[in-house]
Amino acid sequence: QNRKRFILFAIKGGKAELFFEKLDANKATFLKHRGLIAPICVNDAIGDLQRKYGEVQSPDTPRFNNGVYGPINSAYQKYMRHNITGIDIPNSHRFAQSKPKTVEVFERLMVASNQAIRITPKMEMVEGLKKRGVTPLKGNCICPTVTSIPDDFVHYSEPRILTVRECARLQSFSDDYVFQGKYTTGGARRKIEVPRYTQVANAVPPLFAEQVGIVLRGM
């Protein structure tokens, strides 16, 4: 993700700035040991999760369909799937049910710009867009900040919003991480429930957290 983060690091004695220096210096080695090369674009991250590869009934919500795995076409996808051999159905890869008119708006959003920019109704670029702003993703670009609102993004090659699993991939959750609970919720329920999209969006990306842990352990 192209995401700004605020990191506060404190140390009793020593040089606190050393943490950030080590974090930056360790990045290339950290990725190399996992067979990864930065930057990782959207298609590299979620290209094997496209709807075109097939659908089955969702294991946890029978009224919905769940996507299945497509062929691995990047080192990142291989790394995300390395612990789930023999599994055909990704956890939390449930497709939303959108009305035909909504799908038409998604299709117009997909061709409205060559860049992954946030498009708002005031820009008058997309007919029928009523939401405050939507970002149509581009397969060859780095993803903007993953949010807890599913319809903030439109998929780069299919007229739909992202699934929880696709958001999780963009956050660097490996596919063996199982999300549970409701997919979305609203209103007063948000005070007592944490739906899956929010679980993903509010998390510290696991790969980043692992790198931080390695640096801290070495200080």
Please report, for each region that a protein language model flagged, where it lies by residue.
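Flexible, glycine-/basic-rich loop-and-beta segments that form/coincide
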Residues: 2-62
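C-terminal target-recognition/interaction regions appended to catalytic cores
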Residues: 63-219
